[in-house]
UniProtKB/Swiss-Prot annotation:
Its EC number is 3.6.1.23. This is Deoxyuridine 5'-triphosphate nucleotidohydrolase. Substrate binds at residues 64-66, 77, 81-83, 91. Keywords: Hydrolase, Magnesium, Metal-binding, Nucleotide metabolism. The gene is dut. Its cofactor is Mg(2+). The keyword Transport does not apply. This enzyme is involved in nucleotide metabolism: it produces dUMP, the immediate precursor of thymidine nucleotides and it decreases the intracellular concentration of dUTP so that uracil cannot be incorporated into DNA. InterPro entries: dUTPase, dUTPase-like, dUTPase-like_sf, dUTPase_trimeric.
């Protein structure tokens, strides 16, 4: 099943977002300007594009795994969420996680990837208890934040 995505190029000199390989889930997003990030620094970087995410879908902006592994470049709010109603320029909140070296990004560098996925839009219903709502108790209950173990050394 194929769905189209309307892309508005705000900066015609930058490449159109594209998949690096046939079948890739994400399309590469490019930096619209030069940026230097000191260790620990974060910055909102424009991409030079806007998109019209269809209703019932969401755009998710993820880090590029190679940049994260090689130089420590990541996204502060990973993944960044682009709602269907947003029509402004996509900007990526990048952060340099390397403790020692600055990261230099040049205009036109690939900085992130955009995935577009279907999303459920459930109606929110307030209840006074889950029992009242007919939702069975689970074995997990309220356990979270490491409650399942798995890290004996921590």
């Amino acid at each position: 099943m194929s769905t189209s995505l309307a892309v508005l190029r705000l900066d015609r000199e930058l490449p159109m977002p594209a998949r690096a390989h046939d079948g890739d889930a994400g399309v590469d997003l490019f930096s619209a300007r030069d940026v230097e990030l000191a260790p620990g620094q974060r910055e909102l970087v424009p991409t030079g594009i806007a998109v019209a995410i269809p209703h019932g879908m969401v755009g998710l902006v993820h880090p590029r795994s190679g940049l994260a592994a090689r130089v420590g470049l990541s996204i502060v709010n990973s993944p960044g969420t682009i709602d269907a109603g947003y029509r402004g320029e996509i900007k990526v909140s990048l952060i340099n996680l390397d403790p020692h070296a600055p990261i230099v990004i040049r205009r036109g560098d690939r900085i992130a990837q955009l995935l577009v996925q279907r999303v459920e839009l459930p109606e929110l219903v307030e209840v006074t208890s889950f029992d009242e709502a007919g939702l069975a108790e689970t074995t997990r209950g309220e356990g979270g934040h490491g409650s399942s173990g798995g890290h004996a050394s921590l």
